[in-house]
Amino acid sequence: MKWLLLLGLLALSECIVHKVPLVRKKSLRKNLIEKGLLQDYLKTHTPNLATKYFPKETFASVSTESLENYLDAEYFGTISIGTPPQEFTVIFDTGSSNLWVPSTYCSSLACFLHKRFNPDDSSTFQATSETLSITYGTGSMTGILGYDTVKVGNIEDTNQIFGLSKTEPGITFLVAPFDGILGLAYPSISASDATPVFDNMWNEGLVSEDLFSVYLSSNGEKGSMVMFGGIDSSYYTGSLNWVPVSHEGYWQITMDSITINGETIACADSCQAVVDTGTSLLAGPTSAISKIQSYIGASKNLLGENIISCSAIDSLPDIVFTINNVQYPLPASAYILKEDDDCLSGFDGMNLDTSYGELWILGDVFIRQYFTVFDRANNQVGLAAAA
């Protein structure tokens, strides 16, 4: 009997899911609107999702990443770096691969308005001579790379490389609700070839399975979760459907089609899609998105937002994304976002033709509806209806 109990405890210990709560806060866009700064901001900082993906096909620098594209991000988690630990609020971003935070090396105003990592206060920090540069808008975040203990939930990684910012020009981060970014994509797109956090977790034997999963709650600030090393079936209904990763860089998959009332409105001959927790909206080619906006009756306001009548939500159809022969319907309650007295379309246009064809981004609008597993061991994405 004792042996059976011991074996049971061992089996349980091998499948521990390390959960990190995410909090839903006001996005950078909302903060700018409340301060009356959005119009001025958009004059000099144009969000363009195309700059985040496949930079080598779009720009000269391999480390280009448009930080304006976090304008609508709403889900954030807490990590700590150093000994004793220094806490930071970060975006857990499956659309990038680097971890970086502001540091005391940085004298930009944006850094002073956020938590800054002080390497002098950490007994375990190890400096390097390597640099990091992430270009965005009219300037760039520059910094250095160092090693230290990074704690994510109850996972303590004692040898994680990360970026310490030295400059953060512009106003992008002045009212940003987060300090830094923790990338969860593949190492092949990591700037300066820095080992991503999850890769290090797996390499160091800190997680029992080479996968992580994400649940984004639709209700209230709390309840969202990123889970490392396992899957908690209480966060979804039915069974997981698995989709092969079509290219190992981003979490990129092949999508069969997009339909409304049985009519194909986009992606007629299949297309590529990136599942990205760091993108709030659902994005695709401008021409296709314009067609969808017209279909649902959305029109732009003075701030460039796509507004729709809130009274129309109940009469709007599902938009169906077919992936690996499985249909994933998005009801209007999912793709129409209520903002105080306004209702906004959850779709955004971008133009980026890659060597893989047209690209779509399945951001938080999609992930809120479908619990998502990012399986590195088998290079696949699992999807199931969120509980």
UniProtKB/Swiss-Prot annotation:
Highest taxon of source: Eukaryota
Any GO molecular function: aspartic-type endopeptidase activity
Subcellular location: Secreted
Residues in coiled coil: none
Record propeptide residues: 16-59
InterPro entries cross-referenced by the UniProt entry: Aspartic_peptidase_A1, Aspartic_peptidase_AS, Aspartic_peptidase_N, Pepsin_A, PEPTIDASE_A1, Peptidase_aspartic_dom_sf
Protein name, as recorded: Pepsin II-1
Taxonomic source organism: Oryctolagus cuniculus
Organism phylogeny: Eukaryota, Metazoa, Chordata, Craniata, Vertebrata
